[in-house]
From Swiss-Prot:
Coiled coil: none annotated. The modification 3-methylthioaspartic acid is found at residue 89. The keyword RNA-binding applies. The gene is rpsL. This is Small ribosomal subunit protein uS12. Belongs to the universal ribosomal protein uS12 family. InterPro entries: NA-bd_OB-fold (IPR012340), Ribosomal_uS12 (IPR006032), Ribosomal_uS12_bac (IPR005679). Keywords: Methylation, Ribonucleoprotein, Ribosomal protein, RNA-binding, rRNA-binding, tRNA-binding. Pfam families: Ribosom_S12_S23 (PF00164). The lineage of its organism: Bacteria, Pseudomonadati, Pseudomonadota, Betaproteobacteria, Burkholderiales.
């Protein structure tokens, strides 16, 4: 335990928090190019084929990004926008694709939570 004098001289050093999405480098989103689009399986209690893409960002980072929603149009060389946000049951996936921007289309026939999936409002039937 330090003495008062030692604290006056040095002071306490505050712990710096590590970023959960370092590839964004404090930006809200980053643009990148898909290098590989594939499906992968989640961790133990869950079972599915989750759609993910390996993305080379404009700042040189290469990250794995999750493609949310039902169906997508992405392939190799698609230009995409990624945001932070991990997928709990996919190890190594710390980013999400932004649907409805750049080459990523919005989710078709989406009625609720449309803004999260880049879906336009459906025309009212008359």
């Amino acid at each position: 335990m330090p003495t008062i004098n030692q604290l006056v001289r040095k002071g306490r050093q505050s712990e710096t928090t590590k970023s959960k999405s370092p590839a964004l480098q404090d930006c809200p989103q980053r643009r990148g190019v898909c290098t590989r689009v594939y499906t992968t399986t989640p961790k133990k209690p869950n079972s599915a084929l989750r759609k993910v893409a390996k993305v080379r960002l404009t700042n040189g980072f290469e990250v794995i990004s999750y493609i949310g929603g039902e169906g997508h149009n992405l392939q190799e060389h698609s230009v995409v926008l990624i945001r932070g946000g991990r997928v709990k049951d996919l190890p190594g996936v710390r980013y999400h694709m932004v649907r409805g921007s750049l080459d990523t289309q919005g989710v078709k026939d989406r009625k609720q939570a449309r803004s999260k999936y880049g879906a336009k409002r459906a025309k009212a039937a008359k």
